[in-house]
Design a protein with these regions (language model features):
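Outer-membrane beta-barrel pore domains and translocons
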Residues: 95-99, 137-139, 165-167, 214-216, ...
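Signature for the C-terminal beta-barrel architecture of outer-membrane proteins
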Residues: 142, 153-160, 190-350, 354-358, ...
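N-terminal periplasmic/intermembrane-space "pro-region" immediately following the signal or transit peptide
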Residues: 22-95, 437
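Outer membrane beta-barrel
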Residues: 79-221, 225, 266-272, 349-351, ...
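Outer-membrane beta-barrel "beta-signal"
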Residues: 350, 423-437
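Extracellular loop and loop/strand-boundary signature of outer-membrane beta-barrel proteins
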Residues: 105-109, 135-136, 180-185, 247-251, ...
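Gram-negative bacterial Sec-dependent N-terminal signal peptides
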Residues: 1-22
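Residue-level detector of the transmembrane beta-barrel scaffold of outer-membrane proteins
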Residues: 89-93, 131-133, 159-161, 208-210, ...
Length: 437
């Protein structure tokens, strides 16, 4: 472009007309030649200025082109990065279980039983700004969705989740370290999931807050379209126990939770190497019999979760009440069978654990623990429920194994019922082996 402009300028200069007096009067040759030289000098100066301006324009154009190329590269990189973040990751686990118990003569005579536990699938990821989390569990005797929700991070601190999501209550996310959870789990007060919407404020300025509204339980409430209301992962109220009902019977009077509000507040303290969360939780909702409102229910808890070096101490005090006229015992359902709990009771749990990193071949971590739980002051006048679990969990690559020795009274899965009246302490030695992918 620069050479073309130079040729055009020189051509223009060459086409300048000589003064008419130059040809007519030879005597004026000297003065006319001087004038022409002056004009040529001015023209050269103009050409030089134009060339300088042209060079500047070319440099500006080159810089603009480079900036546009850089911007395109950045945008392409952002698109690749966003595309890499999008998508759903599939994981899961396969678990087997060995148990040796004091309450089954057949089990003792066989030297214990080794059974298939579960196969589960987990979905986790995002598409655009929408998060997705789900887990479905396949047992020999049932299939259950543990959780399934979509989420959105609508501010730096706040996230909303909608679907089957965890009820914010007590020490989070678990109030236990062992395979059997704590006594609260069998009351529906630990690792419980219902269908609704949850707002989570992440830890900031030393405090966090969870607020939730659950329309009903994860199976659709009292009239959900399911084969059995006991086919679920977490314990929920499924009925009222009437006179003549057995502890493990299908409930003669079905009930379902609905319109439940739940909140959990945690404040985090740090004192040297000691880190503690102090919290309070509460929930309140209604019970429906399929035709009309049958009553109300509520629960609250004080809890703490402390870490000091490799030690972890969890404490929790809880109370709950199901307020239905003339009813002192409720039916609950989970894991394909029904059980009973008192309509009102108090619970206390104490959990201590020690985590030990190791390098023993594939074994990378051990956690030793003792978890103790007690349910007392029961409205149905049944005896206390007690469970103590002493054990160790072992992490080795994709394998995670629990070794638990359980001693319990009136405890589900340990030879009793949460509304039982036994004075015997039962024992269960349990090994749960899981491969996680």
């Amino acid at each position: 472009m620069k050479s073309h402009c130079r040729i055009a300028l020189i051509a223009a200069a060459g086409c300048l007309a000589l003064p008419a007096s130059y040809a007519a009067t030879p005597s004026n040759t000297s003065s006319d030649t001087s004038e022409i030289k002056q004009q040529l000098s001015q023209l050269k100066a103009q050409i030089s200025a134009l060339e300088t301006r042209l060079a500047q324009q070319e440099q500006e154009q080159a810089e603009l082109t480079a900036q546009q190329a850089q911007l395109s590269t950045i945008r392409a990189a952002e698109q690749v990065e966003n595309a890499s973040k999008d998508g759903i990751t599939v994981g899961g686990a396969i678990r087997t279980n060995y148990s040796h118990t004091s309450y089954s003569d057949g089990n003792k005579n066989r030297g214990g039983d080794f059974d298939f536990d579960i196969f589960r699938l987990n979905l986790h990821g995002s598409i655009g700004d929408v998060l997705l989390n789900a887990e479905i569990r396949f047992f020999d005797y049932m299939t259950a969705v543990k959780y399934a929700y979509v989420g959105y991070q609508f501010s730096e601190d706040w996230q909303v989740q909608a679907g089957i999501t965890q009820v914010p209550f007590g020490n989070w996310p678990y109030n236990s370290h062992n395979y059997f959870f704590s006594t609260n789990y069998y009351l529906g007060l630990e690792d419980d999931y219902d269908l609704g919407i949850l707002f989570k404020r992440q830890l900031s300025d030393n405090w966090q807050l969870d607020l939730a509204f659950f329309k009903n339980d994860e199976l659709g409430g009292v009239d959900g379209y399911v084969g059995s209301r006991a086919d679920r992962y977490s314990y929920d109220i499924v009925g009222a126990r009437l006179d003549g009902d057995g502890v493990f019977d299908d409930p003669a009077q079905p009930l379902g939770e609905y319109n439940t509000f739940s909140g959990r507040f945690g404040y985090h303290l740090t004192q040297g190497e000691l880190k503690t969360e102090l919290g309070i939780s509460a929930l309140a909702g209604s019970l429906h019999n399929g035709q009309t409102k049958a009553g109300n229910y509520n629960a609250w808890a004080l809890h703490s979760n402390s870490y000091f070096h490799n030690w972890n101490l969890q404490l929790q005090y809880s109370e709950y009440q199901y307020d239905i006229d003339g009813v002192e015992r409720m039916a609950v359902g989970a894991y394909a069978f029904y059980d009973s709990i008192a309509a009102q009771a108090t619970s206390a749990t104490v959990n201590l654990a020690y985590s030990l990193p190791v390098e023993w071949g594939p074994v990378t971590g051990l956690q030793f623990y003792n978890n103790y739980g007690l349910v007392y002051d029961k409205s149905d006048n049944s005896r206390d429920t007690m469970m103590n679990v002493t054990g160790v969990s072992v992490a080795a690559g994709g394998f995670f194994t629990y070794f638990d020795l359980v001693h319990a009274k009136n405890q589900p899965f340990v030879g009793g019922s949460a509304s039982g009246d036994s004075t015997e302490t039962e024992r269960r030695f349990n090994i749960n082996i899981g491969y996680y992918f």
